[in-house]
UniProtKB/Swiss-Prot annotation:
Source organism per UniProt: Mycobacterium marinum (strain ATCC BAA-535 / M)
Pfam families per record: THF_DHG_CYH, THF_DHG_CYH_C
Subunit structure: Homodimer.
Name of the featured protein: Bifunctional protein FolD
Disulfide-bonded cysteines: none
EC number(s) stated in the UniProt entry for this protein: 1.5.1.5, 3.5.4.9
Family: Belongs to the tetrahydrofolate dehydrogenase/cyclohydrolase family.
Function: Catalyzes the oxidation of 5,10-methylenetetrahydrofolate to 5,10-methenyltetrahydrofolate and then the hydrolysis of 5,10-methenyltetrahydrofolate to 10-formyltetrahydrofolate.
Pathway the protein takes part in: One-carbon metabolism; tetrahydrofolate interconversion
Record-linked InterPro entries: Aminoacid_DH-like_N_sf, NAD(P)-bd_dom_sf, THF_DH/CycHdrlase, THF_DH/CycHdrlase_cat_dom, THF_DH/CycHdrlase_NAD-bd_dom
Gene Ontology terms: biological process: L-histidine biosynthetic process; methionine biosynthetic process; purine nucleotide biosynthetic process; tetrahydrofolate interconversion
Domain of life of the organism encoding this protein: Bacteria
Gene3D superfamilies: Leucine Dehydrogenase, chain A, domain 1, NAD(P)-binding Rossmann-like Domain
Length: 281
């Protein structure tokens, strides 16, 4: 008997139904939410992500604004674009699509975003608010992971969660999210300096793999019945591949597919952040 699928696409569709209703109510009150994107260069993966975000906007009625810039732009031009969106009343929230070309400073670009328009929840001010547990836009992927686990009634309170990967978009903020009183999990954050990773993962009720190493989590590292969330993204022979080996499905109780698991919810909560920002105005 295989694991239960944590279906991100079906869960996203449920969120979109709710968002569509909320956007309709905002429009009726004269507050039309708008999501903007800044895309620098022509990276195919980034272009696909941005297209998907604007397609999602159309599905729920959010206005979408695109700022596509050539790869060789200067820091000054990028800053001007960020400043323009900060001042644009039609833009409720926006994102700078990462990665940026190497000559541009990603951290400086993220810091220049108005924290009140930070749709990704990755501005240093908003990450600080997450540490303090005060209201702010939440990072989309960690929020999607928690929602997906709840949707399938995977117990979080009191659970031991092993998060593999300490990146700023998933690993670090996920640990903060899961240890809030509302989630109340115990989190072990693992990384390249972790000794004897398999011993730790075999103790986990929930494993979140977010390192971008193809099939690094294998069945012998998973306790029978554990929930496994696959967030890592790599390309093998031109195909998107996750961090979780296919044999894990025979051992785990729940597994999120990749693609089709957390990814759709990352995009759904990007729109949710924008709608919530509009509702607060």
């Amino acid at each position: 008997m295989g694991a239960i699928t944590l279906d991100g696409k079906a869960t996203r569709d449920e969120i979109f139904v709710d968002l569509k209703q909320r956007v309709s109510e905002l429009n009726a009150s004269g507050r039309t939410p708008g999501l903007a994107t800044i895309l620098v260069g022509e990276d195919p993966g980034s272009q696909a992500y941005v297209r998907g975000k604007h397609s999602d906007c159309a599905k729920v009625g959010i206005t979408s604004i695109r700022r596509d810039l050539p790869a060789d732009i200067s820091t000054a031009t990028l800053n001007e674009t960020i400043d323009e969106l900060n001042a644009n009343p039609d833009c409720t929230g926006y994102i700078v699509q990462l990665p940026l070309p190497k000559h541009l400073d990603e951290n400086a670009a993220l810091e220049r975003i108005d924290p009140g328009k930070d749709a990704d929840g990755l501005h240093p001010t908003n990450l600080g608010r997450l540490v303090l547990n005060t209201p702010a836009p939440l990072p989309c992927t960690p929020r999607g992971i928690v929602h997906l686990l709840r949707r399938y009634d995977v117990p979080i309170a009191g659970a031991h969660v092993v998060v593999i990967g300490r990146g700023v978009t998933v690993g670090r903020p996920l640990g903060l999210l899961l240890t809030r009183r509302s989630e109340n999990a115990t989190v072990t954050l693992c990384h390249t300096g972790t000794r004897d990773l398999p011993t730790l993962t075999r103790q986990a009720d929930i494993i979140v793999a977010a390192v971008g190493v193809p099939h690094m989590l294998t069945a012998d590292m998973v306790r029978p019945g554990a929930a496994v969330v696959d967030v890592g993204v790599s390309r093998v022979d031109g195909k998107l591949t996750g961090d979780v080996h296919p044999d894990v499905w025979e051992v785990a109780g729940h597994v999120s597919p990749n693609p089709g698991g957390v990814g759709p919810l990352t995009r759904a909560f990007l729109l949710t952040n924008v709608v919530e920002l509009a509702e607060q105005r």
